[in-house]
Amino acid sequence: LDTIKDDIVFWSAGSKPLELVKSGEVSMALAYNGRVGAAILSEGENFEYMWHGQVLEQEYICLTSGSPNRDEALAWMIHASSPESQALQAKYIPYGPMRASGIDLINAGEPFFHTGVNIMPHMPNTPDRLEISTVGDPVWWSDNGAEINERFSAWMGS
């Protein structure tokens, strides 16, 4: 990293990567795919995705022991994790559903995006993109995150 440090622009707000590319300050950026998709699909921007090597995150829905309104919470969890609910968010933002059956529903319903365009080219977890992706390891980060963050912060300050 030392060899490229002077050429890196760090950002702390999700809108910043696209602003940096648009302004010409940088030629490429790491950005949230939902923001890139919104810029392309809703604002007509001319960005392109580079999916190779993307890092997919795992998200969890849990119900803790002794939670109040357990039955209602469980009903919501079942609803939220259904293929239909997972697919529905893609009508408005190209975040991939956590279930492959949700991707199947989107694909079968194209054009799926609320503006009437195809959303599948903007989805991060199509089968072909999964082949060139890596999945983050939450256990590794739990075990090593504090040390890595400390080392990275020290490097940033050097």
Language-model features and meaning:
Residues 1-4, 43-67, 111-112:
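Periplasmic-binding protein-like
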Residues 62-64, 75, 135-140:
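Active-site rim elements
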